[in-house]
Amino acid sequence: MAKYEILYIIRPNIEEEAKNALVARFDSILSDNGATVVESKDWEKRRLAYEIQDFTEGLYHIVNVEAEDAVALNEFDRLSKINGDILRHMIVKVD
């Protein structure tokens, strides 16, 4: 199984309940498509290097995942591009 790290930035003005629901939804997208979520945690609220959609700060969230193939990662990638609460995301394969 390959190991991946996903980092995504959530808009800073989101309510706590909505943020928790968003994180749970995207964790379930990964697990429903065959990946195993090893760890999913909030990192911190950080200042962005440049404005993204008029925001200068963002809530960083890190997810460590194990997956056999790229199906779950592709679905995560597709849906995170559509979602307005996620400002940016990055998927990296861990050696």
UniProtKB/Swiss-Prot annotation:
GO cellular component, as recorded: cytoplasm; ribonucleoprotein complex; ribosome
GO molecular function: small ribosomal subunit rRNA binding; structural constituent of ribosome
InterPro entries found in the cross-reference section: Ribosomal_bS6 (IPR000529), Ribosomal_bS6_sf (IPR035980), Ribosomal_S6_plastid/chlpt (IPR020814), Transl_elong_EF1B/ribsomal_bS6 (IPR014717)
Annotated transmembrane regions: none
GO BP term (any one): translation
CDD domains in the cross-refs: bS6
Keyword Transmembrane helix: no
HAMAP family: Ribosomal_bS6
Family statement: Belongs to the bacterial ribosomal protein bS6 family.
Name of this protein: Small ribosomal subunit protein bS6
Organism for this UniProt entry: Streptococcus agalactiae serotype V (strain ATCC BAA-611 / 2603 V/R)
Annotated gene: rpsF
